[in-house]
Amino acid sequence: MNQPLYTGAATALITPFCNNRIDYKSLGEIIEFQLAEGINALVVCGTTGEVSTLTVEERKNLIEYTVEKCAGRVPVIAGTGGNNTESAAEMSLFAGKAGADGILSVAPYYNKGTKSGIVEHYRIIAEKCCLPVMVYNVPSRTGVSLTPEIYARLSEIPYIHSVKEANGNAASWLMTAKKCAGRMTLYSGNDSDTLQMMSIGAKGVISVASNVIPKRVSDMCRAELLGDRHGALGICLECAELFDVLFCEVNPVPVKYAMARMGFCRNELRLPLTMCTPETEKTIDTALENLGLI
């Protein structure tokens, strides 16, 4: 039986910048805030962390820093994926040596690999790093959609451990849960899908919103895991406005603005991302005010 890397909420950490350099002071404060608020795991170098604009050296430094800062208090999952199989495998190997508890590997994008090619891509990564591998399906970004049939094949590979599902397709979640039951752990990749996915067996979420509200997202997942659907739904409805506005522009633009408004970092992004519009800022401000965050 597959044992989950974590149960509950994992935050897909933002990467704070100051004058185009990684702001480790702010990152350290964000990590401590997350831990104090009861988050269950942390993901570094993911989409929310602007991984595509980080250099290889920056990615390695971020992984090392986060592992060291957490010091075993929660699992650290390192985003190591890419569309170059060898490079993704090497970064995954590095993450393991740095002390990461698992890796998050996005489906290989742009290349349009065959189903067999995608399976082989993940096989090589898993064999290289010998860490729990979380497969990340986000077709809106990658142009590739992993199917329940692909998951079934992946679940037979040692170290292919879990799925972060962000395809928005509830029918496919059911088939994935059926085909991979006991062999791969399912996690939601969208805050707004979390409770629905947990109702069919997902063990939690990799969350964007938990950058801002880690305790609420963690409490929501905990309530659902304990069978308190009423309590979980109450938290979900309270947070629904924020879940929505954090995706009114491309992630992580809104969440970085929100974190800046709360005083955690500068509102600084790397191109080609740019700051959100004044209209979006007002919408985010309203959501933060309604939750008593500013």
Summary of predicted features, one role per range:
Residues 61, 65-70, 94, 98, ...:
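Alpha-helical structural signal in soluble globular domains
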Residues 84, 190-191, 277:
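Helix N-cap/beta->alpha junction signal
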Residues 2-11, 15-143:
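Active-site beta->alpha loop and helix N-cap motifs at the rims of alpha/beta catalytic domains
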Residues 5-15, 33, 37-38, 199-202, ...:
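C-terminal alpha-helical cap/extension of soluble enzyme domains
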Residues 137, 159-160, 270-271:
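Glycine-rich phosphate-binding "P-loop"
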Residues 2-5, 37, 175-178, 184, ...:
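Catalytic cores of TIM-barrel enzymes
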Residues 6, 27, 59, 63, ...:
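A general structural signal for well-ordered alpha-helical segments in protein cores
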Residues 127, 141-247:
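Catalytic alpha/beta core domains of metabolic enzymes, predominantly
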